[in-house]
Amino acid sequence: MRKLFLIMNALIFSGCLGMPKSVKPVSDFELDRYLGKWYEIARLDHSFERGLSQVTAEYSLRSDGGVLVLNRGFSDADNKWKEAEGKAYFVNKNSEGYLKVSFFGPFYGSYVVFGLDHENYQYAFVSGPNLDYLWLLARTPTVETEIIQKFIEMSEARGFDTENLIFVQQK
């Protein structure tokens, strides 16, 4: 099952280093402050996370200067945890929230931070290569309604279909 999870990530993200025209990565991005554990608060549905709850992403430095990515979620249907380990690297400059991420071999997809709590790094709004990929991440399992509303407003303004957001169950 883990192999299927990794293969799906690879197929979906292979060769997808663009971003929606309406999305602009944040500037003044500080990787050191972004590292650590993030909880997935909301997302658009896609096959490689379908049915998962308690989803988290952990980012740490790799010895080659890149970022180690560990995504984890619980499958109620299988009654077990699923994990995917990947790597990420900046696409342009390291002060811009635009990275490429790979969970399988040489295949990379876009990871674009377009909204960020610059002051405390407590939440992030993330896009993939097109308007089908959208996440709200936070340092805590829940966030204030104002943050969710800001996420929805910013995402709608960029053309994302927020009517289909999945709010992730966190324990």
Give, region by region, the residue ranges found by the protein language model.
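A beta-rich soluble binding module of mature secreted/lumenal proteins
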Residues: 16-171
